[in-house]
Amino acid sequence: MEKNVLEFLENSQRMYGEKTACADMNNELTYTQLMNQAKFIGSCLSLKIKPTQGVPVYMDKTCNTLSLFMGIVYAGGYYCMLDTTHPAERINLILDTIQADILVVDNKSAKKAEKLGFQGEIINLDELLEEYHGQAVDSEAQERLGKIREQALDTDPLYSIFTSGSTGVPKGVIVNHRSTIDFIDCFTETFGITNEDVIGNQAPFDFDVSVKDIYSSLKTGATLQLIPKMCFSFPTKLLDFLDDRKVTTIIWAVSALCIVTTLNGFEYKRPSSLNKIMFSGEVMPIKHLNAWRVQYPDAMFVNLYGPTEITCNCTYYIIDREFGLDEKLPMGKPFANERVFLLDDEDKLVDAGRPGELGEICVSGTAVTMGYLRNPEKTAAAFVQNPLNDRYLETIYRTGDLGYYSEDGELFFSSRKDFQIKHMGHRI
């Protein structure tokens, strides 16, 4: 059993070393190149950070960003991707929360980063990689990385993603290796993702949908294609990209799928390799779902549900029939090793025997994350002892979403308790 996500990378490198692991518009890395580059970055960063320390990453996503993430993990730290388009005020709130000693940028983001007023050391990834010529790390660095790995636990943090929540103040969800490994094992097995797949990444790396793209690829030896953001403004470019790169699997925000059908993209082209189409973040309009299913009658369509705080998703529904325009998609069933249930206002269980009654959607299992970074008050409010269990410690996550069971026992999403809305899958 894996205890560190680096085992995903190293296992795939052993089996598929010369296969493309990740590609963007300007670059691609094989599994061997990705691993070696990550080890080089890790050997450099291990001199600058302590184990379990957070490293903020301030750049656009590229193949090198992925090698940086893995390099941070080799150094024993956890990564936190920052959106370079966000206001400096928000970025600085996040940097203050992480209490970072270093900030990693690239040539494109370096000048913008200087204006943040960051007090620690700014490291330019592009400049760092100029010193790297594909060589293996030296024996001293190898020994240093080995010691870090020996001391690592599967409960060590892997990444942090900041959500705004209902207050607009960023909350940093902190997710460990165990939660990620357990979820990705279930996810790839449930949907049959293999080394033959090509995953088309839509989600920004500061959004947890990207976790499924990244680690499903690393786990199985699939190829990860990073789709430029610009493509989602021009469906013809998007469809060309999917077709040219032979993308088989997309795990997108609902709104990204709807862009294609709203602008009649399929009148231009139908990418021929797609066979797994998954979506989350918002309620999927049946009209748009049906338009996609007409184009891909043999593909697997999956409705996914779950907030960042439970490691990506906790339920899934494989669509196996035609839905009418007046119908809603069910949430489906929990992933293996996760329990999903409803609690009423008095913390009593709302089960399928009480159809139509609203309850707060709650989740337990190893996918429940470590809470909010340096925010004990918010953590204590949402990550709580299971009120149905008075026998031993069992932490559950209260999602703040309301759900209900239908007459035939299907679980449905109703609404937020606090009236948040979503944009491109982000809670705002």
Where do the protein language model's features map onto the residues?
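ATP-dependent adenylate-forming carboxylate-activation enzymes
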Residues: 27, 59-63, 77-93, 107-110, ...
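A generic "structured core" feature
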Residues: 34, 67, 71-79, 93, ...
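AMP-dependent adenylate-forming
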Residues: 4-6, 88-90, 103-116, 120-150, ...
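Conserved AMP-binding/adenylation subdomain of ANL enzymes
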Residues: 171-200, 208-248
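Gly/Ser/Thr-rich phosphate-binding loop
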Residues: 219-222, 247-251, 261-330, 336-339
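Conserved AMP-binding
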Residues: 59-62, 83, 193, 203-207, ...
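Hydrophobic alpha-helical segments in the ANL/AMP-binding
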Residues: 9-11, 63-81, 187-188, 210-222, ...
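AMP-binding/adenylate-forming domain of the ANL superfamily
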Residues: 1-160, 175-176, 182, 285-290, ...
